[in-house]
């Protein structure tokens, strides 16, 4: 193992501990299993293809944060995460928080676009090497299309399983426009993520130029 491998490995081990801790006694085991289909597929793929496609530490950090947020939602079910109580405990009051619907799932849909976008950008840049506007447009379209696919999978799972499990997994909380709002938030998160990636690329380019100039001067 090289020095560069230590950080991704540390994130993997920490996530493994979080996964086990939140998976020991989830509120609804069947919903936890459904919610974690994403993790059961994505994590082995990331580990298997680590050598052939290594993301930046920045992208791995974003993936780690998203997966932790997802595990919290899977532990409680997204519609029952006690986020209001947590914020109230930290800030001492919760009267400024929106009433009614539990918005944790909306927050994670936004986080999905924001935190997965860096890895999607690096994947597309490494495998397809798009140029010009397409270098930035393709990752955004990638995230938006996968958000649509996820909503379709949610709907199909709710149809197949039905009952309380289907309702818990779908998590609409009575909002007929829930899927559309989730997709819109994921798109907004991805757009913000794209802006952050562009800023990071510009900063890295400027830093590389400065190092080159310093080396040339020396």
Report each predicted region and the residues it spans:
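N-terminal membrane topogenic signal
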Residues: 1-13
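Short, hydrophobic transmembrane alpha-helix segments
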Residues: 21-33, 44-54
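Alpha-helical transmembrane segments of multi-pass membrane proteins
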Residues: 22, 63-73, 118, 142-154, ...
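Extracytosolic (periplasmic/ER-lumenal) interhelical loops and adjacent juxtamembrane/interface segments
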Residues: 75-107, 156, 160-174
């Amino acid at each position: 193992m090289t020095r560069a491998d230590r950080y991704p490995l540390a994130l993997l081990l920490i996530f493994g501990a979080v996964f086990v801790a939140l998976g020991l006694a989830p509120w609804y085991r069947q919903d936890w299993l459904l919610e974690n289909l994403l993790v059961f597929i994505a994590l082995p793929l990331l580990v298997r293809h680590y050598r052939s496609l290594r993301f930046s530490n920045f992208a791995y950090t974003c993936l780690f944060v998203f997966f932790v947020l997802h595990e919290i939602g899977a532990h409680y079910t997204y519609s029952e995460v006690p986020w209001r109580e947590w914020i109230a405990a930290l800030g001492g009051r919760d009267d400024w928080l929106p009433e009614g619907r539990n918005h944790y799932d909306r927050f994670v849909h936004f986080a999905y676009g924001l935190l997965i976008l860096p890895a999607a950008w690096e994947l597309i840049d490494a495998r397809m090497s798009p140029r010009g506007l397409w270098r930035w447009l393709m990752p955004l379209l990638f995230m938006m299309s996968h958000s649509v696919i996820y909503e379709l999978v949610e709907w199909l799972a709710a149809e197949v399983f039905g009952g309380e499990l289907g309702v818990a997994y779908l998590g609409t909380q009575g909002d007929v426009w829930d899927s559309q709002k989730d997709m819109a938030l994921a798109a907004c998160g991805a757009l913000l993520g794209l802006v952050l990636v562009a800023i990071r690329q510009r900063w890295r380019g400027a830093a590389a130029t400065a190092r080159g100039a310093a080396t040339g001067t020396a």
